[in-house]
Amino acid sequence: TTLVLYRMGDFYELFFDDAEKAARLLDITLTARGQSAGKPIAMAGVPFHAVDTYLAKLIKLGESVAICEQVGEVGASKGPVERKVMRVVTPGTLTDAELLNERADALLVAVVSQSVRGGVAKSTDQTPCALAWLGMASGTLGLTECTQRDLAGWLARLQPAEVIYDRERIPPALGPFLAQPRGTAFTPRPTWQFDAGLGQRKLCEQLKVSHLQAYGAESMSLGHAAAAALLSYAEHTQGRALAHVSS
């Protein structure tokens, strides 16, 4: 789940279960205001000028955070001030130097396996897999296809901050990583986002080319599927096109 921070004046506030979770993880005060369904509304907040410090703590713990900013003017109309989610910060989509800490870049990796649907896939060591990765700060983009046997090795080399995967086709090699994440966030995504045709189009648009032959990726259909989910997720979290990604 994603924690939601609402900008309210000089603070970013969280409510209900988000407030309780944030209070526990960040060691901040949990309060209450008003009522909903006869129960007090849990509330916790952090000063807006220190939000990056708290974001860094949450990201280090593997959490994802949506930043909801005020877009309407206070007092311009009756009722609540209009707010809008401006960006979503996840472990693999960091671009702010303050949040990256010791990492030069935080890699976001998408993994897909050519296998049957329904939970953890029944496959062999030779089952085709693909990885697509993106360094959000550096703007570097990579793509490879491999076998199930080599998937764990690729993840060990890349050391991603976040891995997204098809929730209906989970590569067995991901099992040990999911059981013991060890500093990597794992985010399931719906199967329809791993669309090879969409991925090929997105790659061409992103790289400003008409085909992928120069990159040796024209026929990597499984890689295109991973790229589709990767680029869609990155664009969603940033709330904009990835103009800095060009290689």
What feature does the model see in each segment?
Residues 1-247:
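Charged catalytic and DNA/RNA-contacting regions of genome-maintenance
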